[in-house]
Curated annotation (Swiss-Prot):
Tissue specificity as recorded in UniProt: Expressed by the skin glands.
Function: Stimulates smooth muscle contraction. Role in induction of hypothermia, stimulation of DNA replication and release of many gastrointestinal hormones.
PROSITE patterns hit by this protein: BOMBESIN (PS00257)
The organism's taxonomic lineage, starting at the top: Eukaryota, Metazoa, Chordata, Craniata, Vertebrata
InterPro entries attached to this UniProt entry: Bombesin
Name of this protein: Bombesin
Amino acid sequence: QQRLGNQWAVGHLM
């Protein structure tokens, strides 16, 4: 489940 970490960064970066 590495996509979860990516999605979190995307929301935080936005």
